[in-house]
Amino acid sequence: MDAQLNNLWEQALNIIKGEISEISFNTWIKSCTPISISDNILKLSVPNEFTKGILDTRYKDLLIQALKIVTSRKFKIEFYLESDLEEEKENEEKQKEEKKDNTNDVDGSIVVSDEMSATLNPKYTFQSFVIGNSNRFAHAASLAVAESPAKAYNPLFIYGGVGLGKTHLMHAIGHYILQENPKAKVVYVSSEKFTNELINAIKDDKNEEFRNKYRKVDVLLIDDIQFIAGKERTQEEFFHTFNALHEENKQIILSSDRPPKEIPTLEDRLRSRFEWGLIADIQPPDFETRMAILKKKADVEGLSVPNEVMVYIATKIKSNIRELEGALIRIIAYSSLTNRDVSVDLASEALKDIISNKESAPVTVKTIQESVANYYNLRIEDLKSQRRTRNIAYPRQIAMYLSRKLTDMSLPKIGEEFGGRDHTTVIHAYEKISENLKTDEGLQSMINDITKKLTQK
């Protein structure tokens, strides 16, 4: 933003600040970033479609009026989504790269740091990452890799559910490395984009340029690597890319929604390489972490939210960070649109659709038995029977473990639900599964899947 545009925008903000409530100003107006001003048109960047709609319908005239007071001219306001601007920037960079094709060095090497650092989200840094028990290990591993690329863990494989912070950590690694070494060649890309670029390279007979781009870097970060599974040519290309980088002692960081052994149709040779380094998982945040995330979000956005409202959100929204932050913004928006103070009652109204869906059915021993039996293709009667073959006994222990963890039922009562077993049997099952969870990633993934289905029905 140039100085003249910055000065004009700050003056307009000062005028608007006196016209609307603080919460409306912080929620809507401060979310805008001026891009350019020319021909009496001010272009503003906004974070999402929802914000764009609110600004367009409720605050556009106010912005125009403020600009008129500052400049004595009537401006038009145009809103652009940040995601669209990023895509446009990527396309421009791609066109520039194509124009440089004939002027590259003889060895075909290309400088990617400046170009690729533009694809890193500036908000995703280690400083803005909220650490809790659910992500402490993944955060520590990511920081270790950022501090000593290719010396700590190579590759680093981060896995976890949607919205838990995998992408945040990957961007944070990229930012940290570039901050310490601005000349480092850092590439961040989704597996989908990697695949699409490969397809285009094959189609346009530019395989060598594609390989130079991804094999002559210092750090390669690939998000959602699970999506290359089943794509034979992509797996072949990535296999050789992985080998080339690893042999040159370059850092590789991968993310996925599941551990390598759980990715179906992934070639064994890739699976084994993904397991060469360190595998770190991220679990759904616990209550304390959810509270910390909400407080951090409120501080960053300049929002005033009563503590009891944050407690309410953290108690009701348990699945992931994205939903937590979305719930907070929804409450603030509801407060602004209804011109009411933020309170627990207002929060309950704003989130009634979301929360009613999440609280529709309580978890019971019966629903746990149904889920486990369905997962293992058994009958509930099998779990209650006296049979002790491993294909039945182990699922039974898992069901007992989940029954103790997810319900308030006493141990003797749980035992009764499993064919009249003694409470010590339930304790043994719980302890055995708890111990196995420490080392068995497949079991961790399965328990998480079943728990998610049970708690989000």
Curated annotation (Swiss-Prot):
Binding residues for ATP: G163, G165, K166, T167
A single GO BP: DNA replication initiation
One annotated Gene Ontology cellular component of this protein: plasma membrane
UniProt xrefs under InterPro entries: AAA+_ATPase, Chromosome_initiator_DnaA, Chromosome_initiator_DnaA-like, Chromosome_initiator_DnaA_CS, DnaA_C, DnaA_dom, DnaA_N_dom, DnaA_N_sf
Location of the protein in the cell: Cytoplasm
HAMAP family: DnaA_bact (MF_00377)
Name by which UniProt lists this protein: Chromosomal replication initiator protein DnaA
Species of origin: Clostridium perfringens (strain SM101 / Type A)
High-level lineage: Bacteria, Bacillati, Bacillota, Clostridia, Eubacteriales
